[in-house]
Amino acid sequence: MTHKIIVALDFPAGAPALALADRLDPARCRLKVGKELFTAAGPDLVRALVARGFEVFLDLKFHDIPNTVAAACRAAAGLGVWMLNVHAAGGRRMMDAAREALESLPPGDGAADTPQRPLLIAVTVLTSMSAGDLAETGVADTPAEQVMRLARLAHACALDGVVCSAQEAAGLRAALGADFRLVTPGIRPAGAAAADQRRVMTPVEALRAGATDLVIGRPITGAGDPLAALAAIQADIEENLGRAF
């Protein structure tokens, strides 16, 4: 099976995002909708992507009091999304409330073609954050140490996985087991610019380190032929790992 990369739709409006989606194949990739696009285009954009057959990762990083986050998770499930996330820094009670809100939904509550509840993952440390950045917020640990602490908390709250840098993936995989999803942004094919993410790896490096889901944006969305760019990355994964990953 071809590895389904999560393509980040980092667009300022709905029209170019939908135009890009129409040049991709839902059998080959999933799509990520983040804060900018969701703020500009709203829930209707998510519904339109789901209607096109795409599994959508709603990347809004909910972080609020437990009741508010639980309500937001239920609303996201109603859009038919495949996966959503919260900030692990919101703490145990917030993550428990988010998980319980999704577990309380009957099968099919999200959408007619989405019988299972959305996956719920937690954000650990943003990939743009360095040790110095963390220190300025009062966190004395290194990014890797803080990632491990927050990932262990998310695991204890029975979430499905975490967002993390691929550089932390091997340690998290060893500590948290084979069934915990590791969703890794900061992925750039060999030769691509790192842009605004500091802790980056290539797709093959990230998968070898233990990542389960790769988030890739500009190398695909900025390509003249996005589907060909996606296929090239997937072919490189298969060639280097010896199988379709």
From Swiss-Prot:
It holds the Pfam family OMPdecase. Belongs to the OMP decarboxylase family. Type 1 subfamily. GO terms for molecular function: orotidine-5'-phosphate decarboxylase activity. It comes from the Bacteria. Pathway: Pyrimidine metabolism; UMP biosynthesis via de novo pathway; UMP from orotate: step 2/2. InterPro entries: Aldolase_TIM (IPR013785), OMPdecase (IPR014732), OMPdecase_AS (IPR018089), OMPdecase_bac (IPR047596), OMPdeCOase_dom (IPR001754), RibuloseP-bd_barrel (IPR011060). Its EC number is 4.1.1.23. SMART domains: OMPdecase. Catalyzes the decarboxylation of orotidine 5'-monophosphate (OMP) to uridine 5'-monophosphate (UMP). The keyword Lyase applies. Disulfide bonds: none annotated. The active site is at residue 61. CDD domains: OMP_decarboxylase_like. Keywords: Decarboxylase, Lyase, Pyrimidine biosynthesis. Homodimer. PANTHER family: OROTIDINE 5'-PHOSPHATE DECARBOXYLASE (PTHR32119:SF2). The keyword Lyase applies. This is Orotidine 5'-phosphate decarboxylase. It comes from Thiobacillus denitrificans (strain ATCC 25259 / T1). GO terms for cellular component: cytosol. It catalyses: orotidine 5'-phosphate + H(+) = UMP + CO2. Substrate binds at residues 10, 32, 59-68, 127, 188, 197, 217-218. GO terms for biological process: 'de novo' pyrimidine nucleobase biosynthetic process; 'de novo' UMP biosynthetic process.
